[in-house]
Amino acid sequence: MIILRVVNVAVPLKRIDKIRWEIPKFDKRMKVPGRVYADDVLIEKMRQDRTLEQAANVAMLPGIYKYSIVMPDGHQGYGFPIGGVAAFDIKEGVISPGGIGYDINCLAPGTKVLTEHGYWLKIEEMPEKFKLQRLRLYNIEEGHNDFSRVAFVAERNIEKDETAIRIVTETGTLIEGSEDHPVLTPQGYVYLKNIKEGDYVIVYPFEGVPYEEKKGIIIDESAFEGEDPQVIKFLKERNLLPLRWEDPKIGTLARILGFALGDGHLGEMGGRLVLAFYGREETLRELKKDLESLGIKANLYVREKNYRIKTESGEYSGKTVLAELRVSSRSFALLLEKLGMPRGEKTKKAYRIPVWIMEAPLWVKRNFLAGFFGADGSIVEFKGTTPLPIHLTQAKDVALEENLKEFLYDISRILEEFGVKTTIYKVNSKKSVTYRLSIVGEENIRNFLGKINYEYDPKKKAKGLIAYAYLKFKESVKKERRKAMEISKKIYEETGNIDRAYKAVKDIVNRRFVERTIYEGERNPRVPKNFLTFEEFAKERGYEGGFVAEKVVKVERIKPEYDRFYDIGVYHEAHNFIANGIVVHNCGVRLIRTNLTEKDVRPKIKQLVDTLFKNVPSGVGSQGKVRLHWTQIDDVLVDGAKWAVDQGYGWERDLERLEEGGRMEGADPDAVSQRAKQRGAPQLGSLGSGNHFLEVQVVDKIFDEEIAKAYGLFEGQVVVMVHTGSRGLGHQVASDYLRIMERAIRKYGIPWPDRELVSVPFQSEEGQRYFSAMKAAANFAWANRQMITHWVRESFQEVFRQDPEGDLGMEIVYDVAHNIGKVEEHEVDGKKVKVIVHRKGATRAFPPGHEAIPKIYRDVGQPVLIPGSMGTASYVLAGTEGAMAETFGSTCHGAGRVLSRAAATRQYRGDRIRDELLRRGIYVRAASMRVVAEEAPGAYKNVDNVVKVVSEAGIAKLVARMRPIGVAKG
C-alpha cells in the first residue's frame, strides 16, 4: 500500500539569511510578501503541509502591512498558519477568526457525509444533528481513517450566476460543490475547479447505510434492581443509563458487544466480575479508544509466550505475542451482560443474538456485525481477481448444537437485511460441535465489505476497504463491457457487418469479445485476461488505512438547481471529512515563581503533583469546582482575572503581572452566544486536556542575569508553568462568528483566496461584534488561569505547610496570551499606524520602555513564556526592539507539533513514556496514559531549535531555561 505524503511545492521561497526566508509576491493578489523565520530543518517541515500556502493567502487580505509572518514553530492551521502573525490597518483592514485561533470545508445538498458509526447523513441534515456526530476523516499524516467531533456546520446562499463543479469517478462516485472546495488527490488538496478528467482523487471506499431514527429506552435503572446503587451511579455519571435509541453511544456499545461475543470473556477473576478482550495488540488499542470514549478505563497487557506444537508432520516451536484488554469496572461489565454478553465460557452457554440488536435500526446492526466479524470473521482473500468466501466459525459443546445453529441463523437473517446471503454448514471437529457461516459470491462479499466491513482490526479493515474498491472497479469494467456487448449486438443486427460492430466498441473491448458476443451468444461478460489482480490493484491504488485512488472520468460545470452550499468544520488537525466517499477538506501561558529550590521540592514531588492533580480539575470535558449557571458568567466575560481576584482567587497585585491586566476593555457578553456560555460555564476553573498542563519546573540555566533578576528568577529555583485557555467557550465563539462572516463576506466584496480564510472589515458591524466576543473569550481564559493559580498556591501550602505569600513567595512572573487579536500602534515606513494584530499560536514580545509592559519590567522588556513539550525544556525570553521592527512585537509560542495526537499514540505508549520520564527524574500524573502518549516529547519540534531561531533573529532575547520535574496533565 502507498503512504500518502502531501508536499507543498507551489509556493516559492527566497532565502534572506540563515534563519529568514521570504515568500515573494508570486501571485498578483498578494499585497505584501511573506516572511518566515526557520532553520533548514524547520522550513522542511513547513513545506510538507499548507503552512507556506496559507501564509501567502494571508498576504492577499485587504489592509495588511509589511509581511504575512510565520514563526519557527509554524504549521498548518485553519485559514492562517498556526504560528502566524499579521497586522491590518484598523480602517482599511480585516479581522478573521482563523487568524486568532481556530481551526471549514462548500458542498451541494444531498451530499452524503459519513459518520463514525458507518451511517451517513445528508449534509443539509447536519445543522440539526451535528452535535451528536463524530465524522470519519482521513488523517494524512498517519495514513488511516480517524474520527472527529464536528465544530460547526455552515451554510451560505449561492450567488447569482455562480456555478458548481461535479466530478464523477470510474466507479460512479460523485461529488458536487463550489469551485474552490478542496478535494484530496495523491498530490495533495486540489480545488474542484482544477480537477481534470484523468486525474485521481482519494476515496474512502465504504458505502455505509442511511441513518434511521428510533426513539425510546433500551435499558433503565429497573434492569439493575438489587444491584449496588454505586453501579447505577457509575453508569449515570457516564450517561450510560438510561440507554436510549437516539444516543449515538448505542453504535459504540453495539460494536463492543459484537467484538465481545467473538473475542471477549465475562467472568469472575479473584472474586471480582471482570470483562476481558483478546486479540492482536493493535486491535485491542482500537477497542480501548471506544471504551475510553464511553468513560470506561481498560488496561492493556502484552506479553510474549513460547509455544511448541506437535502435529503429524512434525513439531513446531517459536514465540507469539499475546494481548489482553481488561476492564475492571463491575458496573460496565454488568451493563454489557444486560445487553446480551453471556457470563462464563461461551462454548458452554446457550444464547442468541440479543433482541435489542434484532430490533435495532440498520446502522446499529451494522456496528454489531462489524465488531463481531472484526473479532471472529476471516479476512477477505483473493485468488487472482476472484474473492474467496468470508467465514465466521463458531463452536459449542455438543449438547448446544441447536442453539449454535439458531445463533448463526440470527446472524444470517441480519446479514440478509444488508443484501448479504450466506450458507451455514457443519465442520468436523473432535471435542465440540462446530458450524461455519460463509459469505460466498462476488455480490454478497461486495455488499458485506461496502455496508458492514470490519471494526477494530486495522489489518482486516484496511484490506476489506481496498477489496470493496477493487470489486466496485471490477463491476464497473464489467458494466462497461456489458454495454459494449449490447451496442455491438444492435449494430450487427442492423447492418450484418461485424467490422462495423467492432469499430463502434473497439476502445472498450477487443475483436474476439465482439465475435463471442455475436457468434457464440456470450451473455455474461468477464473482465479481460490482463485485468489487474487484487494484489496488483492494492499495490497501485491502495493507500494506508484502506483509502484508494480513483480515476476521474467526468468533470462538469453546472448551474445549481438548489440555492445553498454547505460546509463542515471539524476539530481534528486533518481538517477534512468524507463526503460521498471522497476526502474533502485563546490559549495562554502563565509562570508562577517560588522561593523553593529543587532540593526543597524533589523529596515531595510525587505528593506535590498528585495534590495539584487533585485540586485543579483536568481532563477531556473537565468541569471546574465553581458551579456557575451559564446565565451567571457575564461578569467573568467582562472583568476576566479581576472577577476571579474579587471572588478571592488570588491577590490584587497579581493583575499587574498579566498581559492587559488580565482584562480586555470592550468585552461584550451579549456578543457571546448562549451555546458558548453553556459550554464555558461548567468548565470555568479547569485545565482541560491535550497540550494543556501544569508543570513544576526548575530554572537550570540563566542566559541574562540582569533580566532574570528583574523577573525574580535564579538558578535552581522551582517555578510552576500553567498552560490553558478559554476552553469550549472560546472555540464556540470562533465557530459562531465563522458562520456569520461566511454569510457577510460577499456583502463587503473581500477577496477570498481560501475558503478557510473568512474575514470581514474590522470596522464593520460583524467585525466589531466578533472583536467584542473575542475579548470576552480572552477574559474568560484569564479568569480561568487566575483560579488555577489560586489552587496551585493552595496545593503548595497543603504540601509544604507554608504560607504561599509570606513564606513561599509565589508571585506571578507573567501571563501571556498566544491566540489573540489586539489593536496596537506600530511603525510602518517611518509612520505610526494603528493596526489590528492577529497572533495565532504566537506571543506578544514588547521591548523595554513600552507602556503596555508592567512598570516592574519596563526597563528590561516584556517576559515571553515559551513552553516546551512534556519532558523537555521551557524558556523565558524578553521582548526586543527587533520584534517591534520586524514582527509587530511578536515571537513564537512553543515547540509546535510534528505528529498528530493519534499518530503519537501509535508510535508511543503512555506507560512507557511515563516510566522513561520517571527515570529522568520527571514525575507525570495524567488523566489517562493516552494523553501521555499524545504529548510525548517526540510528537513535537525541538523547542531548542525554535528558540534558537527567534534569538538569532533578534525578535526575542534568551533569559532563562527551565527543565520539568513534575507534570500534571488532563
Swiss-Prot record:
The active site is at H893. Mn(2+) 1 binds at D103, C587, H692. Its cofactor is Mn(2+). GMP binds at residues 691-695, 818-819, 867-870, 874, 893-896, 969. Mn(2+) 2 binds at C587, H723, H818. The keyword rRNA processing does not apply. One of its GO terms (biological process) is intein-mediated protein splicing. Keywords: Autocatalytic cleavage, DNA-binding, Endonuclease, GTP-binding, Hydrolase, Intron homing, Ligase, Manganese, Metal-binding, Nuclease, Nucleotide-binding, Protein splicing, tRNA processing. Its EC number is 6.5.1.8, 3.1.-.-. It comes from the Archaea. GO terms for molecular function: DNA binding; endonuclease activity; GTP binding; metal ion binding; RNA ligase (ATP) activity; RNA ligase (GTP) activity. Disulfide bonds: none annotated. It catalyses: a 3'-end 3'-phospho-ribonucleotide-RNA + a 5'-end dephospho-ribonucleoside-RNA + GTP = a ribonucleotidyl-ribonucleotide-RNA + GMP + diphosphate; a 3'-end 2',3'-cyclophospho-ribonucleotide-RNA + a 5'-end dephospho-ribonucleoside-RNA + GTP + H2O = a ribonucleotidyl-ribonucleotide-RNA + GMP + diphosphate + H(+). Residues 256-420 form the DOD-type homing endonuclease domain. Gene3D superfamilies: Homing endonucleases, tRNA-splicing ligase RtcB. Binds 2 manganese ions per subunit. Ligation proceeds through 3 nucleotidyl transfer steps, with 2',3'-cyclic phosphate termini being hydrolyzed to 3'-P termini in a step that precedes 3'-P activation with GMP. In the first nucleotidyl transfer step, RtcB reacts with GTP to form a covalent RtcB-histidine-GMP intermediate with release of PPi; in the second step, the GMP moiety is transferred to the RNA 3'-P; in the third step, the 5'-OH from the opposite RNA strand attacks the activated 3'-P to form a 3',5'-phosphodiester bond and release GMP. PANTHER family: RNA-SPLICING LIGASE RTCB HOMOLOG. Belongs to the RtcB family. Essential for tRNA splicing and maturation. Acts by directly joining spliced tRNA halves to mature-sized tRNAs. Joins RNA with 2',3'-cyclic-phosphate or 3'-phosphate ends to RNA with 5'-hydroxy ends. This is tRNA-splicing ligase RtcB. The lineage of its organism: Archaea, Methanobacteriati, Methanobacteriota, Thermococci, Thermococcales. The gene is rtcB.
